[in-house]
Amino acid sequence: MYRETFVFCVLLAVVSANVEMRDLEEKPEKYKGVNCCYVSAIQECIPVGETRPFKHECKGWTCNKDNLLEVSCGKVLVEHYVEDKTAPYPHCCPVAKA
């Protein structure tokens, strides 16, 4: 049990994310009545419960019923990690190397 707790605490310290909550934007007429979050930056309406990656950054938007979350990888707290900056979020986030 001690080992599992220790490993969990280490992973918790190594893995972090950055989340910013945004108010929902007003939807254009064509999206009125659609259960989605309109994002003017991409001129797209993301269905509630889904995530869309940013085009040129390792971030994503997650649509919730009452808000839009802008999510990114956060900081890596280890010296050795791998990342694929060409992959869409969240696959572009750094991962600790064993």
Curated annotation (Swiss-Prot):
List the keywords (alphabetical). Disulfide bond, Secreted, Signal, Toxin
Q: Give the domain of life.
A: Eukaryota
Spell out the family assignment given in the record's similarity comment. Answer: Belongs to the caterpillar 1 family.
Q: In which tissues is it expressed?
A: Expressed by the venom apparatus.
Could you tell me which InterPro entries the record lists for this protein? Answer: SVWC_dom
Protein name in the entry: U-megalopygitoxin(1)-Mo1
User: How would you describe the post-translational modification of this protein?
Assistant: Contains 4 disulfide bonds.
Q: Which GO terms describe its cellular component?
A: extracellular region
Localization of this protein: Secreted
Pfam family, any one: SVWC
Show the disulfide pairing.
none
Q: Where is the signal peptide?
A: 1-17
| GO molecular function per UniProt | toxin activity
- Asked if Secreted is a keyword of the record, the answer is yes
What is the role of this chain? Answer: Probable toxin.
